[in-house]
Regions:
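Von Willebrand factor
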Residues: 1-30, 35-87, 113-124, 147, 151
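DG-centered beta-turn motif at the end of beta-strands
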Residues: 69-70, 80-94, 132
């Protein structure tokens, strides 16, 4: 998306991708990459599109994903703002205490935003709203996996507009 790419380059955003699922299922799939030019953005987007799904038919352990993401900032570039973008299509059925990790993120100055992928109802959206996002965060909802592209674009534009406001 040209609008998103331009803003990412202007702010020199650094991105990384962590795939997650169950208690022992978190993987840094793409390490930190700083968006210094439109070609960096395009290369990163292409790499994301080529990523195979790391975990299939596993539990849902968001606390462990949050732990992995918080620790991953130690390996990234220095930045004025740190944001975890967490997406998922279910509520927890394994793992630790999500609220504790949310409080840890807030104490560390990390914002957590969510992208809830719904099937029927709003269980994931409600879970993300009540337990995952930080006080300065928000949840965007995708109505199924086919709606993900629209929802992620809207979510990224909202995050970036917070910076450029």
């Amino acid at each position: 998306d040209p609008e998103i790419a331009e803003m990412q380059v202007l702010d020199q955003v650094a991105l990384s991708v962590i795939q997650w699922s169950g208690v022992d299922a978190q993987e840094v799939s793409l390490d930190w990459t700083q968006m210094l030019s439109p070609s960096h953005v395009q290369l990163f987007a292409n790499a994301v599109q080529r990523l195979p799904r790391a975990f299939v038919m596993s539990n849902t352990a968001p606390a462990e994903a949050m732990t992995k993401a918080l620790g991953h900032f130690d390996h990234g570039p220095n930045s004025a703002r740190q944001v975890i973008d967490m997406s998922g299509d279910g509520t927890p059925n394994a793992g630790g205490e999500v609220n504790r990790l949310r409080r840890q993120a807030e104490r560390s100055g990390v914002t957590i935003n969510g992208l809830a992928i719904e099937g029927l109802g709003r269980a994931s959206t409600n879970f993300y709203t009540r337990h995952v996002i930080t006080a300065d965060g928000f949840v965007e909802t995708a109505q199924g996996h086919r709606d993900y592209a629209r929802a992620i674009r809207r979510k990224i534009l909202r995050e970036i507009s917070t910076v450029f406001g």
